[in-house]
Amino acid sequence: MEPIRFTPRQTLLAALLAATFCTPAMASKAVSWEDILNDDKTTGDVLSYGLGMKAQRYSPLTRINTKNVDHLVPAWSFSFGGEKQRGQEGQALVHDGVIYITSSYSRIFAIDARSGKRLWEYEARLPEDIRPCCDVVNRGPAIYGDKIFFGTLDASIVALNKDTGKVVWKKKFGDHKIGYTMTGAPFVVKDQKSGKMLLVHGSSGDEFGVVGWLFARDPDTGEEVWARPLVEGHMGRLNGKESVTTGDAKAPSWPRDKDGKLVDAWNHGGGAPWQTASFDVDNNTVVIGAGNPAPWNTWHRTKEGDDPRNWDSLFTSGQAYVDASSGELKGFYQHTPNDAWDFSGNNSVVLFEYKDPKSGKLIKASAHADRNGFFFVTDREKLAKGAGYPNKPTSLIGAWPFVDGITWASGFDLKTGKPIEKGNRPPAPKAGADKGDTVYVSPPFLGGTNWMPMSYSQQTELFYIPANHWAMDYWTEKLTYKAGSAYLGQGFRIKRLYDDHVGTLRALDPKTGKIVWEHKEKFPLWAGTMTTAGGLLFTGTSDGYVKAFDARNGKELWKFQTGSGVVSVPITWEMDGEQFVGIQSGYGGAVPLWGGDMAELTKQVTQGGSMWVFKLPKSLKN
């Protein structure tokens, strides 16, 4: 795998355009913590990634509903312009009549929500030697006070004045030359103990062999408050000083060489929390998915001659529970111990409550649809307690397959919290060979689902998962770490699982694991979902449609062709007595870069880069 590189012309253009383009705008009111905390309840704005602290992506709006959604029409469309298109995976924010949206190549725009007019634009000056593994995407900004925040592909995070787009501060958190980058949206929380506001964000770069970090900063200055590595035995920081190691300082879940030192893979161990967190306010806990271990090759993280199942490669490919005050890892549930398939664990961890069908007790839970093909429900109270060793496999409540044809495991043991493996790990190369024997794996490393966030409906009490059916041929390869180069030790070829579809949108009951309904798509699904109190589910498709479904039964009620693949996340808000739905269009992401047969399938999808906003005609608004 080669990193994406810039041509000299692209670099010159970036230098010329990096200055902010600005149309003077009226100063809007500052965003408070109370505004952000109530984002899931208020309807006139969208102030957080996930539409609330719990990341449920559920809106209480009802003006657009199952009875009238088929009348939706475009209000306006905004082009991101220039030659830079690629994948548009962002989720927009809305505040005081202004939309804030990021786009490919580390750009951010402020747009008048009523007219679609650009108010200002900022484009980061990106060096030629950035190393994003999976396209030059950006998944969105955060907002607080008078500032808007977003990450850039050169491993930096930037704060801009939300009214002018002028840079307030910029902080670099890693060396982009060796693989550190940032694609996820930052997240604003309030430490419930100290009262301090925190800007929380992760790093990316597992595929280049870097240790993943989760950071918390002062949103006013950008100064680091704490930093937490997600590889066991690595040291964290608090207020600029060393704090405590992550887990056991001896890192017993990683093997040692004959010289007694930890294996080299431990130095490059991955675990990057590159997606966006949710926040358990009651427990003052940042909840986030941890990325895959590095390298992918399981044998580099296993003691020679031993069983990989004895070496978990903590704290990777799971869900992490971090104390907002100290940055210490309180709890962890690992979806894929000693992950050999790049199943990662980054996609959203959604916080929700339900009544236990047997006892009637209210359960405070977390839900996660993993790339490994299983849907997990965990006890977030147990995971946030912070007692003893952080790894808490017995926090598992349920684990059910949400896609077909899973080859690596038959299920999970609820007593131990561990997977019941089926012997699907690719063997190491034999003596004298450059690669190992090929195994057939489903889902492939692109996952049963991937980064695209699922949603939860408080009406139906179902989760809505943008999933895919596919597989891969998979084999180990010889590997030596080289800074700035891909650090995988695996070869692969993505293949079809079924002839009639790849994408499958599925509604799942988290109390039973039952698939209530599904909708199939020819192309891979790579967009997130959103539900509303109007009984609707919104998402996008790789062949260019924005679609609305009846959340109860999966009936397709409306669609609109945007002209390019939709691989972003929908939002909704109300303004001037009308409800609006917004989403980005612009095909890209990991599938066309890494997708094998899937990349060939989607060649016909045209490039693009735009923001679309929809509403009901005036005659139907009431």
Provide a role label for each language-model segment.
Residues A55-G174, T532:
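N-terminal cofactor/phosphate-binding cores enriched in small/glycine residues
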Residues L160-N161, G165, G212-E224, D306-S326, ...:
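Beta-propeller blade signature
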Residues K29-P74, V244, G423-K430, I494-K495, ...:
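Blade/loop signatures of beta-propeller domains
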Residues V46-G50, Q85-R107, P132-S156, T181-E207, ...:
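Repeat-blade elements of multi-bladed beta-propeller folds
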